[in-house]
UniProtKB/Swiss-Prot annotation:
Its EC number is 2.7.7.59, 3.1.4.-. It catalyses: [protein-PII]-L-tyrosine + UTP = [protein-PII]-uridylyl-L-tyrosine + diphosphate; [protein-PII]-uridylyl-L-tyrosine + H2O = [protein-PII]-L-tyrosine + UMP + H(+). Has four distinct domains: an N-terminal nucleotidyltransferase (NT) domain responsible for UTase activity, a central HD domain that encodes UR activity, and two C-terminal ACT domains that seem to have a role in glutamine sensing. The lineage of its organism: Bacteria, Pseudomonadati, Pseudomonadota, Gammaproteobacteria, Pseudomonadales. It comes from Pseudomonas syringae pv. syringae (strain B728a). Coiled coil: none annotated. Residues 1-341 are annotated as: Uridylyltransferase. The keyword Transferase applies. Its cofactor is Mg(2+). This is Bifunctional uridylyltransferase/uridylyl-removing enzyme. Residues 342-704 are annotated as: Uridylyl-removing. Gene3D superfamilies: Beta Polymerase, domain 2, cca-adding enzyme, domain 2.
Amino acid sequence: MPQVDPDLFDRGQFQAELALKASPIAAFKKAIRRARDVLDERFRSGRDIRRLIEDRAWFVDNILQKAWDQFEWSEDADIALLAVGGYGRGELHPYSDIDLLILLDSDDHEVFREPIERFLTLLWDIGLEVGQSVRSVNECAQEGRADLTVITNLMESRTIAGPEHLRQRMLEVTSTEHMWPSKEFFLAKHAEQKKRHHKYNDTEYNLEPNVKGSPGGLRDIQTILWVARRQYGTLNLHALAGEGFLLGSENALLASSQEFLWKVRYALHMLAGRSEDRLLFDYQVRIAGLLGYEDNDAKLAIERFMQKYYRVVMSIAELSDLIIQHFEEVILSDDSGTPQPINSRFQLHDGYIEATHQNVFKRTPFAMIEIFVLMAQHPEIKGVRADTIRLLREHRHLINDEFRNDIRNTSLFIELFKCEIGIHRNLRRMNRYGILGLYLPEFGHIVGQMQHDLFHIYTVDAHTLNLIKHLRKLQYTEVSEKFPLASKIMGRLPKPELIYLAGLYHDIGKGRGGDHSELGAIDAQAFGARHHLPAWDTRLIVWLVSNHLVMSTTAQRKDLSDPQVIHDFAQFVGDEVHLDYLYVLTVADINATNPTLWNSWRASLLRQLYTETKRALRRGLENPVDREEQIRRTQTAALDILVRNGTDPDDVEQLWSALGDDYFLRHTAGDVAWHSDAILQQPADGGPLVLIKETTQREFEGGTQIFIYAPDQHDFFAVTVAAMDQLNLNIHDARIITSSSKFTLDTYIVLDHEGGSIGNNPERIQDIREGLTEALRNPDDYPTIIKRRVPRQLKHFAFAPQVTIHNDAQRPVTVLELLAPDRPGLLARIGKIFLEFDLSLQNAKIATLGERVEDVFFITDANNHPLSDPQLCRQLQDAIVKQLSVNSEPGNDLRISI
């Protein structure tokens, strides 16, 4: 800490100002304001961050000393003012906790009660927010023994004012001789760390990470130092290195990583104007700018900054694991077991694998891959001994092109993917120890690569490894209940290692600019050649990487009731083997991207596409389903149900004659019978008919189906979706049919706001039915736009809506595809625009992915014809862009093909 820094705090000038004032408060406040401005300016100008936080602690020391001196303490008074915790370490960020301990010799506080209260009141009055405790030396011992947080705080203390001997006595009575011996302290701190990591999902890669508490954050470094201090009395990283427990390179890496996180935390506090350790979207862009990051052709500044952040915390996590493992071996292990040989290079020591000698990786570099294969083949191995982790780190520079092309290494790497268990766990270890990104440089490029959206909640490397984890879990019995079809298919894949390899490469092209699927396919082709895979295996992996998005896109954006859609997709996959691999990869990809994306409705769409495509492949691509044949089959089956229930066939025929072919193509026989029976029983003046039921497995299991039958009116869709929005229903599919008798037959598949179906909830169903009926009876009185605040996170992902308009080659409709930021009431806004342009909605596919929507609308003009006027299309596009823009102006986002 500085001894003198008059620009930050001039003691003489401050003393003079105190003498001139009747009250000291104004002088203190002025000094605090000035110091904050000086320190913030030093940060902006690039001041060394370590000096900066020490300067702030030095300034607060001076302020506290001056405040303490405002009161009369006798020279022999047994009372001292101590800094504890982070402040005790001499580290203060703009709004860090200023933790104080007022330490007394006697358990009797009464003699000092009044001056202590006046001292704390002064601190409050001058705007210094402190956390304080008042304890005697004996009370410190009692509370330290009982509370892990208290003993940790007391270990980091400095005397600010008063006699030093009190602090020394406190340290003596709270030493390991009296409480918290190093073994007990280590176990408690390790458990505390695990609990804290679990709070943050056990990943360094949260979208809005906590700089202090998340895995790889500042708290992990502090945990190392706390354990070291309890065991060795070591004060800092440099001293730990001096004791031989950290290599010089490890010390340098931890120190530089700590300084980077300090910069981020300092900027967070400065921008937030309060204590804030969450790297929220609100601040990420501005911090990237403060730290000097700029956009380039491939990545935004925020993506470059966050990639640096994630790589830093990953390095901290790696070293933290190593050091904690080292502490565990030193503090907990009795080291009495005899190592059990595995082969000439490795042995098992207390359940952990270790190298048999220091030169294993130097003499046999292939052992850097072999060690992970051995752990997969021997699942009883708990992990890697600390010294061996260190050896791996020291020798990974040997991974060069010669290493990558060595057939021993390529064979071992493929062998890992053929192991029955441990694939994901050991790929994670390879990534944690920096081996995977060196062996596969293309993977190294995506380590820590974020995507600035709410759809992808993990970095690319974390998502990739999660995908492999999901693939592996499909073979677990408990998971097969949630994913029965995917689990069944996974169990019969002829070469499961190929799906793992496709998963490893599916997103590897991200962050380079261009189509990541195409770039990844090129990398996958090169991987297959380098690893001497059979030609068919390589072709399948490349095909899967190149087309890994096609199945989800088809399921979510195409009309799966259209036989032509199924036929086209069947032609695309070509055979059942490709269909099986693609389906399993798609299921794992969605679940590994964002757990909230996977819901029963999305599952049902993929299952339907898989089942219908498999049926088409078995029937033969040369024998596609005829539309007329499908209509006849649906009508025959539906009529059979109705007649068995006592319905007059003539009434049915009269009703059906007005419905048109599309109705029977888009609905199952069961739904047709359900609708028809209710419509025929509906009184002529009964108002809108609203039917609600859970969908069955064959009919898109997992969503709630709402069927509405009513006289057609121009604002029908706009009013309906606005009412559903108010009822907290998320629409995932809409099928709009208008009969020749001018009645609308609309079917909506909805989920609740948490992504589940409505279920068997009579009260909720009745509320929905009454809400929709009331809205449709009184459309003029109903607000078509629900005004709600845009959620905080969505505000940071605004982009110009993109609208694509083209006519369908197979059907007489115009297809309007929309990519836009999500916002409350979006569909109601779209419905309002369709109303203004006199357009009829025939069908809609709705998908919300994180902060954006990807919707497809099938529309016609007032005469039920496709749109043919390019000028009208441009006006429609402009209206949508204007209505849906959050913070962006309409741009040239139109693609029209009329």
